[in-house]
Amino acid sequence: MCGIVGYIGKRDAYPVLIKGLKRLEYRGYDSAGVALIDKKRRLNVYKTKGKVSDLEAFVSQKDVSGTIGIAHTRWATHGEPCQANAHPHFSSSKNLALIHNGIIENYATLKEKLQKKGFIFKSSTDTEVLVQLIEFFQLSNHLDLLTAVQLALQDRKSVV
């Protein structure tokens, strides 16, 4: 089980996201993270093992500006509870960040194919495989993001 919160608006996204994650704490989780797009259009990801309060402490001296963001609390299904396995996950270029709830049944096969193409993985989660697959389709076929996501979702057995 996980909690997913997203925000696009005029206010700073970080406080909205943290408030949303705190409302979902009762569901149980082992890690928390946020991805924010700042005013310079940079994508920043901050994540940690532990509670939302641990995430708040971790980012206390970091730039959490931006009016667009996603946030996630994770209950591990693939990979141990640790900072590397916490969501959101970056693509190799760090241009995409993804959070996900569910299980990608054929993630190991997809991961192996992507590794043979030079992709490097920093976690043992199925979600990181999905964000790398999206980027692979986007870059190798010169596709827009929506089409790359659609192709990536066709190439998996099960996203629940």
Language model feature labels by segment:
Residues 1-160:
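Conserved short alpha-helical segments that host acidic/polar catalytic motifs at enzyme active sites
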